[in-house]
């Protein structure tokens, strides 16, 4: 099960303290983020804004307020502690004006039910390692280990590097899941302590990639080639109906994988498990009109890639 965190005190997030990482979840017994049984550490902060993202709480590199109106008892404790009058509690319930909120987090600290909570906790490498090492026996028996995900761990690369070093010193298999949108100099340092790269490829066309993620793909494709030349690499592609499921794009992804020596492409079918998170963050979900992929579509896409000569798997 994943673990959600709550900030225990207000913190100034304008400057990240040295060797602290901003983590929004640590998921134990994960089987979808690399080989074996793994612990996945989710880093906050991402350079992309993928329209289908199932972890929108990962985008920003600072702690944020998330709401759960069902849990609100209208007790009113949050209103007086807000220094900018961003909260109003009346008979209809609690209202949070995010345009006024200064992210002091005081409201979440006094909320007794979790109707106001914080996503993102500053942690030391030692604190994360305590979670990671708890399942060492499972890693040994299953060929598993730790996976750094997000967001994108490269947004906090110095902390990620220290964490990976610690894992390697303790004989724990390491993997990173990344968008690849970072300077190669940064990625190369992290890869020195990485056994497996789970490298996301959203679309092979630069313009379509820009539309879907907010960024072009030139840097990403260059880094994919360099990454596969350095460490064992799996490509991962979110399968979004009407966006990147064309035969042309699938063949291009497969050819890229063959060119760079990737072991396989993992197809991750679009889902709406993260849809409710958008409302809890005060955002609109942008994919309301996108259908879920049918089993036939997923199998067809898998076959297109396999016919090019690259192994394809579904969901991991």
Where is each model-derived feature located?
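Conserved dinucleotide-binding and phosphotransfer motif residues
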Residues: 114, 166-170, 308
């Amino acid at each position: 099960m994943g673990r959600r965190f709550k900030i225990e005190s207000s913190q100034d997030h304008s400057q990240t303290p040295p060797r602290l990482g901003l983590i929004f979840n640590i998921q134990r017994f994960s089987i979808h983020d690399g080989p074996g049984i793994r612990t996945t550490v989710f880093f906050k902060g991402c350079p992309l804004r993928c329209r289908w993202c199932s972890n929108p709480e990962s985008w920003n590199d600072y702690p944020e307020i998330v709401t759960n109106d069902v849990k609100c008892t209208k007790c009113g404790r949050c209103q007086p502690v807000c220094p900018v009058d961003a909260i109003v509690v009346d008979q209809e319930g609690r209202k949070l004006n995010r345009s006024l909120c200064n992210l002091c987090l005081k409201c979440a600290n006094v909320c007794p039910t979790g109707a106001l909570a914080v996503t993102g906790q500053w942690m030391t490498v030692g604190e994360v390692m305590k979670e990671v090492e708890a399942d060492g026996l499972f890693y040994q028996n299953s060929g598993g280990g730790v996976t750094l995900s997000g967001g994108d761990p490269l947004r906090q690369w110095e902390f990620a590097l220290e964490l990976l070093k610690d894992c390697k010193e303790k004989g724990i298999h390491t993997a990173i899941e990344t968008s690849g949108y970072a300077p190669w100099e940064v990625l190369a340092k992290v890869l020195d302590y990485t056994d497996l790269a789970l490298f996301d490829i959203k679309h092979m066309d630069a313009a379509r990639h820009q539309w879907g993620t907010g960024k072009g793909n030139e840097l990403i494709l260059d880094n994919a080639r360099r990454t596969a030349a350095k460490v064992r690499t799996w490509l991962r592609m979110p399968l979004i109906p009407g966006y990147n499921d064309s035969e042309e794009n699938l063949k291009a992804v497969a050819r890229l994988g063959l060119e760079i020596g990737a072991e396989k492409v993992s197809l991750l079918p679009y889902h709406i498990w993260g849809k409710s998170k958008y409302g809890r963050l005060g955002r609109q979900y942008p994919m309301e009109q996108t259908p879920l992929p049918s089993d036939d579509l997923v199998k067809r896409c898998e076959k297109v890639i396999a016919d090019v000569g690259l192994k394809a798997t579904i969901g991991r």
